[in-house]
């Protein structure tokens, strides 16, 4: 599983002009599921997302986590993160999980997040989404499980 997290001042996801998920200050996380990923990987990734220290403390150092600042968590599925881009000029998606597995693992991540964190929003799996964000920093990290 790959998770591209971005610290945001605000973010929202629209599908067909309708807002399906939005947060204020927090993390926008694009999630790509790979064939070897399962529930254990989802749990490990959620722990990282909630506890990774990307927010500034009183001295401006990145010492505070999403859980510490009680920020929003916007999870958006993005199978293109799992693409193989090592050769050629066209990405190969054979390294991404099949859609049914990708959806199951992503939904498990969302379910765990909603139990563990008070502010969770999502995009819509498999939909053509427009993601709007106010990038804070910018601060962006690629996490893998």
Swiss-Prot record:
Q: Which GO terms describe its molecular function?
A: D-tyrosyl-tRNA(Tyr) deacylase activity; Gly-tRNA(Ala) deacylase activity; Ser(Gly)-tRNA(Ala) hydrolase activity; tRNA binding
Gene this protein is translated from:
dtd
Can you tell which superkingdom this protein's organism belongs to?
A: Bacteria
**UniProt organism field:** Pseudomonas paraeruginosa (strain DSM 24068 / PA7)
Entry's localization field: Cytoplasm
Similarity comment: family membership: Belongs to the DTD family.
Q: Which PANTHER family match?
A: D-AMINOACYL-TRNA DEACYLASE 1 (PTHR10472:SF5), D-TYROSYL-TRNA TYR DEACYLASE (PTHR10472)
State the span of motif (Gly-cisPro motif, important for rejection of L-amino acids): 137-138
Protein name as annotated: D-aminoacyl-tRNA deacylase
A Pfam entry, by short name: Tyr_Deacylase
What binding partners and quaternary form does the record give?
Answer: Homodimer.
EC number annotated for this UniProt entry: 3.1.1.96
Span-the-membrane segments of this chain are none
Function comment:
An aminoacyl-tRNA editing enzyme that deacylates mischarged D-aminoacyl-tRNAs. Also deacylates mischarged glycyl-tRNA(Ala), protecting cells against glycine mischarging by AlaRS. Acts via tRNA-based rather than protein-based catalysis; rejects L-amino acids rather than detecting D-amino acids in the active site. By recycling D-aminoacyl-tRNA to D-amino acids and free tRNA molecules, this enzyme counteracts the toxicity associated with the formation of D-aminoacyl-tRNA entities in vivo and helps enforce protein L-homochirality.
Top enzyme class, one word, equals: hydrolase
User: Does this UniProt record's set of keywords contain Hydrolase?
Assistant: yes
Q: Which reaction does it catalyse?
A: glycyl-tRNA(Ala) + H2O = tRNA(Ala) + glycine + H(+); a D-aminoacyl-tRNA + H2O = a tRNA + a D-alpha-amino acid + H(+)
Example GO CC term: the record gives: cytoplasm
């Amino acid at each position: 599983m790959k998770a591209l997290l971005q610290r945001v001042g605000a973010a929202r996801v629209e599908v067909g002009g309708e807002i399906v998920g939005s947060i204020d200050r927090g993390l926008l996380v694009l999630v790509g599921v790979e064939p070897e990923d399962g529930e254990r990987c989802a749990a490990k990734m959620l722990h990282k997302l909630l506890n990774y220290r990307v927010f500034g403390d009183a001295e401006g150092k990145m010492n505070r986590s999403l859980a510490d600042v009680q920020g929003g968590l916007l999870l958006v599925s993005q199978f293109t993160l799992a693409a193989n881009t090592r050769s050629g000029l066209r990405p190969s998606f054979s390294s991404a999980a099949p859609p049914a597995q990708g959806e199951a693992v992503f939904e498990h991540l969302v379910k765990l997040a909603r139990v563990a964190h008070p502010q969770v929003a999502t995009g819509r799996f498999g939909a053509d989404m427009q993601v709007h964000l106010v990038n804070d920093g910018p601060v962006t990290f690629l996490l893998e499980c």
